């Protein structure tokens, strides 16, 4: 009987050694897989951040270019209005000179009409220049908002990739632990497997199932 006990102890020790060896191999593989996943995640995050940075730079450059174009257009509009005002005033002056021989009343009316026309032209030019300036400001504001939203989206995407990688690592470790627990449950010695504190609820469930059969 003592020989049977010794033989049982030997088999139990041998089973435990094989189990520990297999557990170590599985944990090593899990750690290696987790390291590869983390490295891939870091690389992906770096690529995403670089792409976002490049996109932001391109958008900002485009915004600057559009703002410069709008500024040039506004300046051109203002210059054209100034030229038009000068031409109108000059034409009015010439008309006034030509009508000098007419009666004082007629001359006064023409001069007043010329002044009124010049004032209307100047006012229209100012209004057009103001509208062009406001449109340029609005366009620059919209472009800046788009740039900001693009940067925030790239950051959120990077955070999501890192979170998914973390979940993958956790799932891999849990899967390795469950596999070890199932191996212990099928080892033959149900009592010893149930007493192993590291196997958890999975080994206990397996032991119960084995006894029922």
From Swiss-Prot:
Compositionally biased intervals (Basic and acidic residues): 13-23, 41-74, 81-98, 109-140
PANTHER family in the record: DAUER UP-REGULATED-RELATED, RE19971P
Entries under SUPFAM superfamilies matching the protein: Apolipoprotein A-I
Region (11 X 11 AA tandem repeats of T-E-A-A-K-Q-K-A-A-E-T): 27-143
Designated name of the protein: ABA-inducible protein PHV A1
Region annotated Disordered, chain positions: 1-158, 182-213
Coiled coil (UniProt feature): none
Top-rank taxon: Eukaryota
Comp. bias regions, Low complexity: 193-213
């Amino acid at each position: 009987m003592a020989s049977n006990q010794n033989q049982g102890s030997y088999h139990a020790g041998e089973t435990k050694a094989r189990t520990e060896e297999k557990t170590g191999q599985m944990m090593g593989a899990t750690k290696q897989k987790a390291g590869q996943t983390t490295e891939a995640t870091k690389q992906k995050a770096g690529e995403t951040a670089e792409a976002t940075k490049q996109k932001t730079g391109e958008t900002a450059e485009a915004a600057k270019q559009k703002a410069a174009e709008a500024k040039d257009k506004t300046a051109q509009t203002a210059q054209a209005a100034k030229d038009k005002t000068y031409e109108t005033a000059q034409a009015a002056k010439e008309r006034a000179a030509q009508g000098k021989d007419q009666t004082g009343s007629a001359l006064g009316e023409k001069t007043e009409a010329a002044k009124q026309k010049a004032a209307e032209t100047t006012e229209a030019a100012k209004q057009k220049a103001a509208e062009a300036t406001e449109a340029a400001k609005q366009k620059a504001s919209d472009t800046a908002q788009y740039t900001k939203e693009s940067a925030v989206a790239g950051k959120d995407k990077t955070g999501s990739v890192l979170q998914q990688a973390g979940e993958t690592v956790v799932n891999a470790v849990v899967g390795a632990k469950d596999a070890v627990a199932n191996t212990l449950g099928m080892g033959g010695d149900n009592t010893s497997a149930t007493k192993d504190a590291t196997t958890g609820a999975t080994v206990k469930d397996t032991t119960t199932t084995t006894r029922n059969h």
